[in-house]
Amino acid sequence: MTREIKPLFGTDGVRGRANHEPMTVEMSVLLGKAVAGVLQECKPGRHRVVVGKDTRLSGYMFENALIAGLTSMGIETLVLGPIPTPGVAFITRAYRADAGIMISASHNPYWDNGIKIFSSEGFKISDVIERRIEQMVAFKEFGNLPEDYAVGKNKRVVDAMGRYIEFAKATFPRGRTLNGLKIVLDCAHGAAYKVAPSVFEELDAEVICYGCEPTGSNINDNCGALFPSVIQKAVIEHKADVGIALDGDGDRIIMVNEKGHIVDGDMILSICANDLKKKGILHGNRIVATVMTNFGVLKYLENVGIDTLISPVGDRHVLQNMLEYEANLGGEQSGHMIFLDYNTTGDGIVSALQVLRIMIESESTLSDLTSPIVKSPQALINVAVKEKIPLDTLPLVQEALRDVRSSLGDSGRVLLRYSGTENICRVMVEGLKKHQVDSLAKTIADIVDSELGVGIIE
């Protein structure tokens, strides 16, 4: 009889509600053992693993559980404490560690948590390695336990934040500062709550902080990259030059210009791509974007001579395409920006610094930089669902999709997909007229909600 291997990994690691399967202490111990087992399979001997986390209350128990699993298998753990996900990727490389683990559910509510695993090079592990970890966990076959004298040690890296701060600052040109810029910064009460203000302040910006007082249960709570209205209002109130909103683990960014208008990942990607092309350092004059990228943005990129490779949604898919096609810039509308010249994963702070550098070098406001980009009207509605039933098996949903596509003709498009990290169905409609796409998106969302949902998320 074949034993079933239960999938643990989604599109961005293991994720779920804390103290519910799969995010339990028991599972975390097993995952720690499995990571150790994979490392031993790849290269027998002593190994070191970096462990970081965001500010969720449950991070403490998962941190200890992972360390227990790892050290029981002879792994030395280097504990960073609260630090952005890109900080874990950076320090994994800097310490020549064999792997890195980030305990975070990214933009999800505080009651969720997750585990992201990085290779020694700072890249998220491959599907093959994920399947091997799942196999080890399912069969509890991790290899031989070491003798009592060979279990691993646990060390705290006391200057982890400082190291990442200096790394981030080093991506900004020497001799330049942010002097004269007033920045509204929202850290979502998350992993970047200390490092992000320090980076911008040490570069001599005036920083007005929001979302920098984590309690363990307020991460992403009506703040951060998913709720840019906070910094929209604050930028106007404080007459700031720019607003920067990060998510709970600091790997994505949404910006706001001096007029209080949102500058999303599509716009940030376009600004940075055009700048790198002008400097002659955009590899192959190509970037990687996703199926969610606005058509107007794609048209702008085409007009300035930049080829855009389209990947599925998810920073892992973006990165895979970047590596395959040797691109050094890629990103998503949601705010994941990957600058491979600097880091191996999305990095909100580094992305912000690149936009600020362009503003300073060109003596432009953020609204000046985005003014040539005319986005197509687009509507995005999120529907919370009870379970992710294959959408192509739902006749009413498929009928609605056919009707909407017929209404749009060749002048628009519709995308319907499940989130890879939450029980959410995303409805995206793009077309020529705002009122039309809003109406059509709501039509589909209402039908999805009636078939599967527990409510439309405002």
Curated annotation (Swiss-Prot):
Transmembrane in keyword set: no
Pfam families: PGM_PMM_I, PGM_PMM_II, PGM_PMM_III, PGM_PMM_IV
Cofactor note: Binds 1 Mg(2+) ion per subunit.
Active site: 106 (phosphoserine intermediate)
Catalytic activity reported: alpha-D-glucosamine 1-phosphate = D-glucosamine 6-phosphate
EC number: 5.4.2.10
Modified residues (Phosphoserine): 106
Family indicated by similarity: Belongs to the phosphohexose mutase family.
Binding locations of Mg(2+): 106, 247, 249, 251
Phosphoprotein recorded as keyword: yes
InterPro entries listed in its UniProt record: A-D-PHexomutase_a/b/a-I, A-D-PHexomutase_a/b/a-I/II/III, A-D-PHexomutase_a/b/a-II, A-D-PHexomutase_a/b/a-III, A-D-PHexomutase_C, A-D-PHexomutase_C_sf, A-D-PHexomutase_CS, Alpha-D-phosphohexomutase_SF
Gene Ontology cellular-component terms listed: cytosol
GO biological process entries: carbohydrate metabolic process; peptidoglycan biosynthetic process; UDP-N-acetylglucosamine biosynthetic process
Free-text function comment from the UniProt entry: Catalyzes the conversion of glucosamine-6-phosphate to glucosamine-1-phosphate.
Cofactor(s) needed by this chain: Mg(2+)
Keywords on record: Isomerase, Magnesium, Metal-binding, Phosphoprotein
Membrane-crossing residue ranges in chain numbering: none
Name of this protein: Phosphoglucosamine mutase
MF (Gene Ontology): magnesium ion binding; phosphoglucosamine mutase activity; phosphomannomutase activity
Domain of life where this protein originates: Bacteria
Taxonomic source organism: Chlamydia felis (strain Fe/C-56)
Post-translational changes noted in the entry: Activated by phosphorylation.
